[in-house]
Amino acid sequence: MISWLPSVAMGSRLLCCVALCLLGAGPADSGLTQTPRHLVKARGQQVTLSCFPISGHLSLYWYQQAVGQGPQLLIQYYNREERGKGNFPERFSAQQFPDSHSELNMTSLELTDSALYLCASSPNEDSEYGETLYFGEGSRLTVVEDLKKVSPPKVTVFEPSEAEISRTLKATLVCLATGFYPDHVELSWWVNGKEVRDGVSTDPEPYKEQSGANVSSYCLSSRLRVSATFWHNPRNHFRCQVQFHGLGKDDQWDYPEAKPVTQNVSADTWGRADCGFTSASYQQGVLSATILYEILLGKATLYAILVSVLALMAKVKRKDS
């Protein structure tokens, strides 16, 4: 929740205040929703963003925040009527409908349109005493020259080092996602089928694999730290999942390669027993023990049947005699 004066006339003071507030805090869980959250488009295409304000709120705002810059007001509505505009290109259009939701349309997209688009709402019209704005999570748009550059990540999980385990009695698994573009990814760790957050440390944001304007692929790393005892249990399953936000199913794709759609890419590993067993050897041992048990059980059953048959034959002979 952020409090500031949203009046268009406030100029640089508004920009400074919003930039400090937004860059210093994450989106508020306010009940305002935006769709879609991620978009990847080619230059010249068009997109539509939707915003659903909090019920009863009369003021609605659209902002554009480019990388490394503060948010810029695009357009403001009060009670579904336009009340002001900022730097609003002619290629852009917006509307607020009778049900209060709003759409921001962008046509003939340019590379410079790549930004985070934020929608906010407030219960009242702005005043000189300030007004509290409630923001959504934003819609992130990346415009590329060539959709062929879009690529999902390759994910690898590296097991803990024995040196660390011996020294600290802790085990750190490392997940590395490489070769993806754009940098629209969300990384999570899963242990035994459940997402975990304790002990997880992930890079603040993806970074370019190599410096230079011609390099476009990104990488991201994350670490999961558990106790040595937990790691040495071969039944524990560790999985690193990277959700890549790529093209939509309806986006045109004219290349022979697989279409880089939004997808989950994962890598996993199993815990390793302290006595040197791997997960595979542990499972093989369990399987062998199960088979041996079934063989012994089968032999016991056959022996019981044989004894029963012999006893029955002896009983029949006694009757005959």
Swiss-Prot record:
<dbReference type="InterPro" id="IPR003599">
    <property type="entry name" value="Ig_sub"/>
</dbReference>
<keyword id="KW-0393">Immunoglobulin domain</keyword>
<keyword id="KW-0675">Receptor</keyword>
<dbReference type="InterPro" id="IPR013106">
    <property type="entry name" value="Ig_V-set"/>
</dbReference>
<feature type="region of interest" description="C region">
    <location>
        <begin position="145"/>
        <end position="321"/>
    </location>
</feature>
<dbReference type="InterPro" id="IPR013783">
    <property type="entry name" value="Ig-like_fold"/>
</dbReference>
<feature type="glycosylation site" description="N-linked (GlcNAc...) asparagine; by host">
    <location>
        <position position="264"/>
    </location>
</feature>
<protein>
    <recommendedName>
        <fullName>Viral T-cell receptor beta chain-like T17T-22</fullName>
    </recommendedName>
</protein>
<dbReference type="InterPro" id="IPR003597">
    <property type="entry name" value="Ig_C1-set"/>
</dbReference>
<keyword id="KW-0732">Signal</keyword>
<dbReference type="Pfam" id="PF07686">
    <property type="entry name" value="V-set"/>
</dbReference>
<feature type="glycosylation site" description="N-linked (GlcNAc...) asparagine; by host">
    <location>
        <position position="105"/>
    </location>
</feature>
<keyword id="KW-0325">Glycoprotein</keyword>
<dbReference type="InterPro" id="IPR050413">
    <property type="entry name" value="TCR_beta_variable"/>
</dbReference>
<dbReference type="Pfam" id="PF07654">
    <property type="entry name" value="C1-set"/>
</dbReference>
<feature type="signal peptide">
    <location>
        <begin position="1"/>
        <end position="28"/>
    </location>
</feature>
<feature type="region of interest" description="J segment">
    <location>
        <begin position="129"/>
        <end position="144"/>
    </location>
</feature>
<dbReference type="GO" id="GO:0007166">
    <property type="term" value="P:cell surface receptor signaling pathway"/>
</dbReference>
<dbReference type="GO" id="GO:0005886">
    <property type="term" value="C:plasma membrane"/>
</dbReference>
<feature type="glycosylation site" description="N-linked (GlcNAc...) asparagine; by host">
    <location>
        <position position="214"/>
    </location>
</feature>
<dbReference type="InterPro" id="IPR036179">
    <property type="entry name" value="Ig-like_dom_sf"/>
</dbReference>
<feature type="region of interest" description="D segment">
    <location>
        <begin position="123"/>
        <end position="128"/>
    </location>
</feature>
<dbReference type="InterPro" id="IPR007110">
    <property type="entry name" value="Ig-like_dom"/>
</dbReference>
<feature type="region of interest" description="V segment">
    <location>
        <begin position="29"/>
        <end position="122"/>
    </location>
</feature>
